[in-house]
Amino acid sequence: MIHVFFNNQKSDSLKMSSPNKSLLFLAFIFIFLSQNSCSPGKNTGQDQKSQLLQLKKEISEDLLENLLPYWSMIMPDTINGGFYGRVDASEQVYPNADKGGILNARILWTFSSAYRIFKDSSYLHMANYAKDYIVSHFLDEEYGGAYRTVNEIGEPADTRKHTLTESYFIYAFAEYYRATGDQKALDNAIEIFKLLEKHALDKDLNGYYEVFTRDWERSRDLLLNENSPEDEKTMITHLHLVEAYAGLYRVWPEKQMEERLRNVLELFINKIVDKETFHTIYFLDRNWNPTTQIDSYGHDIEGAWLIVEAARLLNDAELLEDVEKLSIKISNAAKEGLEEDGSMLTEKDLSTGHVVTIRSWWEQAESIVGYLNAYEITGDESYLDISMNSWIYIKNHFIDNVNGGWFSLVSESGEPVGRDKANYWTCPYHNGRMGMEVVERIQ
């Protein structure tokens, strides 16, 4: 009997009584290691174990020898502090580019998590550097929360408060506290959480609004979908609130935090996931009516595993069972974006039939974690095959073996298309987190 062990309980996660399905998920594969008992085309248990360990080896090598060193070397702005706001596909640094809040928060999260797992002092140095710059330049001392962008010398540029951006600062500060025990970082995460609950929450219809002025007055500025003025709520923001609130609850298990995590998780389940297609609904009006018809495959598969991660923290066996079942349905829906070459497409507009065939780095990374999660839940090796094929595609097309790091976009034929390697959205968080999820899950 072969035991493939997945470690789903992080070393410093909440100490709770185990639900019916332990948080330490054991994927038991009962296979007799004889030719007669193996189905044609199926791997033996030993083959699966070898595959998983090889996957972990290759991904951890890329993480530790390529991805994290690349971001450590090229991104720090040694003149003005913080991190450069843009690096293009030819490795050209743009020192005058504005510095994005999401980019800086994601860098803080990535190196905090890396230090927590690997205990490498160089990662702590990067995390400290990121945290100090954020505290000094992004946090708004007068009105609270964090600016959306600052200029190259750290002065406020876009002072609007964007719920999505604020969620990443919660996520990053909570992870930094988890890695270092720095109380001020936890205080910062809690303060931003309370500001969102005060200003961003729709107290009548539930859910969270998108954009605010610096002093937290509601704004109808369109940041995520400039073509739909009816949008007031988005899948992306609610997904990353699930992620951020789960991260904060893990280190701050107060009753109010538990209630708000449960609320946003249930919102995602009941309002964001389409109960007929099991795709996530991209944009919605205030009353939760869809305003667009877009299937975003990467967000589907990312959401599929993040909702399970959140449910596991809530110590509710019935909820976890329901969420795991839903996660598999979402994962199956996201298969519509998978191509024969192992890649995942970006999205499809159902109103026009237009498919965005360009491949983005983050969807490929989330595909690995999402289908590994589905494999853990079900033991169905077809999900493991998807994760393996995603990694093969990444190795062949996304890893930059010349300059380091990953390309951010490749064409349908797998060629880099010249997109920035770092900017407001492009960061080490999706692929870095994928690497750390694989390292922690596969034991």
Where are each of the predicted segments found?
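Glycan-recognition and catalytic cores of secretory/periplasmic carbohydrate-active enzymes
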Residues: 42-443
